[in-house]
Amino acid sequence: MLNIFFGITVSVFIAAVTLHTVGTFKDIRILKNISKPFLIFSILISHALIIVSYLPDSSLLLIYGSLALFFALAGSTLFMLKDKTFKIIAVPFFILSIISKLLVTFPSFRLYRFPILVSILFAVLYATGAAVPFLIFIKKKSAIISAAYAVMILSIGTYTYSAVLSFFGELRIYTIFLFMDSLSMVFAAFVKAKKETEELSSPLLDFISIMACTASQIFFAAGSVMMQAL
């Protein structure tokens, strides 16, 4: 079942990125607009994968995970509407989604015997990283820059430490997937922040940031499948 969801995620992402790429380089606004709902849908599917893989461990994780998905879906739907009022209302939903993901991530990594410090860092990283794909579409420079540097700092320390601890253990492959996920998120956020701060208008930068965001979610979904298989 997880493999099916993973296949759906990758397929939808490929379709969305194709539409976005063609729309960007050909300056076809409707294609760029169509691609955004597909990308958000794929993000939600990939987030659902890791929650499903934790189901045998704790019903509490299912509750937190379901809340995270609900708030993310509600926030995404509101944010896609043209009225600025709806975009403002969407912000609290994104915050609640991030908090819910923080709650589901921390006990999950504790279940797999990560040291307490690593568990906290992982949880904070994913709480921050969960917002990055959505921030790709937001024009607020301060929010993008904050997300870019927060993910960068947290990922370097957290993933380096955890990779060393688990390299010879059963979580080696899973950690590699998460490490690649983190690097992709960092790269996407950094490119977006650089573009906004320097006020660059380049279809190539748009393409690079959306591809990095795509890679991040695919690695995230793949890591979820690997965790379920362990």
Regions found by a protein language model. Give the residues of each.
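Polytopic alpha-helical membrane-helix bundles and their juxtamembrane interface segments
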Residues: M1-L230
